[in-house]
Amino acid sequence: NDSERTTICRKFYKHLCDLFIESIKSFTISEKKLTKRFVIKNPELIDSYALKNQSVIVVGAHYNNWEMFAQVTPLYHQHSCFGIYKKLSNDFYNSKMLKSREKFGFCMFSMNETLKCFRQKTTKAIFFASDQSPSNYKNVIWTQFLNQNTAVQSGVERLAKLYDYPIFTYHITKIKRGYYQA
């Protein structure tokens, strides 16, 4: 009904504005404030692999505040934390985004540098936000989603098998305005 649609629309735009403001704030946020606003639950699940010198893959989505997630991740994990990203077309905003994400030790690799990332000689956690439409339809898996054929990326699975890395997933939950957990 119209009332429900209006409510959903208002909540969406409020959340979108929050993400925009939080993204701007992420350029100046301190480590102390960041760890207060974003908590990672059960980091020991992934860290148990770091203790065995085993690298891992962590997969999630562009959901809630993934920018804060990228910043806070190295503060919670013993692995070197690497992220794979798609380069923005605007060089200015691309460099700002990289600077923000790498602020507390997260190391970014462009999609073209994925294999370079995997070849780094360190125990690492490699993070993917794999929720976007595949750019190459040659190596996709087709499945039914919302009653239609949908292409799903298969690169993470292939890389995990090739390098024998376990895969973990993350889900970001908004606790309240400006506060999250994964």
Residue ranges of predicted features:
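Negatively charged linear elements and acidic catalytic determinants
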Residues: N1-K36
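Soluble catalytic domains of membrane acyltransferases
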Residues: F27-A182
